[in-house]
Amino acid sequence: CKMSTKEEILSTYRRNINVKEQYDMPDLDALKGVEYSDPVAQFIAMSKAVGGDVVTLERGADVNEAIRKAYPEAKVFTSNVPGITIAQRNPDTVGSAQELNGTDVGIVQGEIGVAENGCVWVPQTMKERAVCFISEYLVILLSRNSIVSNMHQAYSRVRMTSYGYGCFISGPSKTADIAQALVMGAQAARGVTVILTD
């Protein structure tokens, strides 16, 4: 039986791999993340720089009214976040992700905000995570007390839910073609608003 080209390549590759010693991992303690004296202000500035928006919810204000004010033309809201009463759809009770198509505004809970790049860790806390990407606009609720300075700090706080999925979202979807023409909202939300709560 003659070996195929693939088998020959893999056989040669395996014969020539000689890992004789294990190298120590480099000391990463010297790599310190940036620290901001006011992480909330930096988070707001970076969120706007990447095309997002930030609304600071005043104590006692109704988050539903703040969302309606930010998106007055929206008709279909989707959320499973407790206290969101304007949602007509719930990503936990739809039969499939396709039923979320046509969502004007998806509303999700963020866990960690990162000042250095304006991103928010959004763990999957709903059956259909497509709400984060299929919605025309996305609202992320985030406690201002959950904003850290850098990604090192954020990664140390990330905890996975039972769904085993989460993602960092930084502003609206962005893509560029070979001519370097930036397009917002081509693959996911056309706009992202972070609402900072207590």
PLM region spans:
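The feature marks the mature, well-folded catalytic cores of soluble enzymes
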Residues: K2-D198
